[in-house]
């Protein structure tokens, strides 16, 4: 099963479908008049995963991330980039994911980013 993302005129993902065969981008685009790009359900941060671990064959990694509604397709990177979660976060161009300006605390607690305080706050 392959997955395909429909792009709008601004390269925003507006729809994602599953289809039975590979390499249907051109066929979907021609038949619907919309632009479609294949996306890999098992790709995240430029790494392809099988059963939750990086796959031995990384040639299956496709467009950095599985496309979701609201993601952007970046033609120059050939990548799906998720929406920016906070204004202060920075795009890691190597993996096409947004990173916080401060690393997540590693003390085992559950934290959430507080944009106003520009810090991680313990979730209670």
What name fits each language-model region?
Residues 1-124:
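Interaction-interface detector
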């Amino acid at each position: 099963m392959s997955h395909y993302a429909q792009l709008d005129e601004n390269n925003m993902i507006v729809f994602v479908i599953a289809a039975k065969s590979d390499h249907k981008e051109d066929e979907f685009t021609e038949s619907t008049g919309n632009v479609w790009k294949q996306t890999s359900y098992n790709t995240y941060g430029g790494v392809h995963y099988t059963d939750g671990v990086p796959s031995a064959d990384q040639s299956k990694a496709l467009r950095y991330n599985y496309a979701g509604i609201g993601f952007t397709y970046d033609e120059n990177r050939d990548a799906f980039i998720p929406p920016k979660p906070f204004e202060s976060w920075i795009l890691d161009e190597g993996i096409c994911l947004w990173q916080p300006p401060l690393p997540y605390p590693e003390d085992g607690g559950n934290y959430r980013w507080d944009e106003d305080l520009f810090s991680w706050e313990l979730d209670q």
